[in-house]
Amino acid sequence: TYQADLYENVTDDKYALIYSQSLNVTLKDEFQPYLYPNQYVWFTKDSKAVKKGQALSDDSADDLDYVQQVYHYVIENITYDKQKAETVASGYIPDPDATMESGTGICFDYASLMTALLRSQHIPTKLECPASWWSDMPAPPITPGSVYICTRSAGWITS
């Protein structure tokens, strides 16, 4: 089941819910939504993240080894940006390539980059971000930028 909500701009960056609908959807392949870019995990065939993902994949023995290489790449090459974390505005959208270029990021940047690296190499990866990242609603009880990965050998795992 999907939830589709339509919001109307009230003033500045404030929105009001004007329509909500639950949709029952049957997917031919349950993994398809977790293989493609979206606004939080943007990449194209020319992205730095895709090129880095390919390089890491070429050095991997299997999909689980690739996941480990991606994890180590991200934690060893991206430094946590405390100032950004303290000043990030509601509605922030991460950019995996910009995170790679700057070498810094917040939890959402780490998760978005990891998801882009994995999805670009056909590893189904789900990125969950709390509502607080994109609205003034309280955050649900999950870790900011939770990443769920599905591998052939281990099934769904959490980073």
Predicted features and spans:
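N-terminal accessory/pre-domain segments preceding catalytic cores
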Residues: 1-64, 68, 156
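Hydrophobic/aromatic-rich core segments of domains that either
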Residues: 109-159
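Short regulatory "switch" loops immediately downstream of catalytic or recognition motifs
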Residues: 10, 82, 132
